[in-house]
């Protein structure tokens, strides 16, 4: 097991222990459904309130750089915060669950998948990972996200609900990116 997996697993164990609903997205989720690649951080969407923020911060202890005020501000603004493992410099980015329709739908579709040889974890669905990565492409950060999408389609393509992606790509304004990907 890599040092990243150890750190990520420890953080996931804390979320589970505290009963904080979460969902892994980003490159870690893309790797779970697609092709392996190097990643040095993990993106996690959380549904966290102020009380849980304090418990979470305290549970991380001295092993992590964590700023409770940053967590509380992220909760207030529906923004994001991060923690960094103080020994290895490994980062976990947390995004507070937003109220937008797509974000709520994505969170409702999360699923348990194997994370490592020790545990299962809650991931965004492969369809939702594809949609989020296309949103990032729309914002200008494209190459690695496009490669992740192609990897998911290559490895998990037969299990992907294409009509769901068609529907949400249209609703969130990324059909042009999706149509280009489907034609390649």
What is each stretch, according to the model?
Residues 1-184:
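Compositionally biased terminal segments of proteins
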């Amino acid at each position: 097991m890599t040092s990243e997996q150890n750190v990520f697993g420890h953080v996931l164990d804390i979320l589970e222990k505290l009963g904080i609903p979460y969902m892994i997205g980003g490159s870690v989720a893309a790797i779970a459904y697609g092709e392996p690649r190097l990643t040095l951080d993990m993106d996690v969407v959380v549904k966290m309130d102020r009380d849980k923020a304090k418990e979470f911060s305290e549970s991380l202890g001295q092993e992590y750089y964590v700023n409770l005020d940053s967590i509380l501000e992220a909760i207030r603004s529906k923004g994001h915060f991060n923690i960094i493992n103080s020994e290895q410099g490994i980062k976990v980015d947390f995004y507070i669950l937003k109220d937008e329709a797509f974000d709520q739908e994505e969170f409702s579709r999360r699923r348990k998948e194997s994370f490592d040889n020790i545990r299962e974890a809650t991931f965004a669905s492969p369809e939702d990972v594809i949609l989020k990565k296309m949103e990032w492409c729309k914002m200008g950060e494209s190459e690695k996200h496009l490669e992740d999408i192609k990897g998911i389609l290559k490895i998990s393509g037969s299990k992907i609900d294409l009509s769901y992606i068609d529907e949400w790509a249209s609703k969130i304004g990324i059909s042009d990116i999706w149509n280009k990907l489907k034609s390649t």
